[in-house]
């Protein structure tokens, strides 16, 4: 049997102490909207989106969404090796990248970096479909695309001829991600 003093018992059952707001915030929260001027040290990064082509063919193309943008600090981008003019954002749809990137997560993509480093994440266009996958180079110029949710989404391997025929292209390397829980 363990015997506690009244002070230890009270401390054990006391509600957790709240940190003062100053302990977790460094300065005020700035609220901004589309009318707020952009500071010199920030850029607005556009989102990419799939657009269905005419005549209901089911085919899509990837375009810049001119209405949706996300603010990034220029220093933050350059610290990741990304030139601000090469930054884009992409929304993840589906469960193929769970548990790392959930449905609805947003990732930052460097369109100036398309050289595959095995295992890194890339935004890819696959026959006009926008996808985010781990990519691996295969001997002879092929490519392996991997999902984190491999139980439901097994690896996909493509020969160089299949890469061309299925219109698989690397859009850019993922450098940042965020999601809500």
Name every feature range the model reports, one short phrase each.
Residues 1-103, 164, 177-181:
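Short, positionally conserved secondary-structure boundary motifs
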Residues 78-181:
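Acidic/glycine-rich C-terminal interaction modules and beta/coil loop segments
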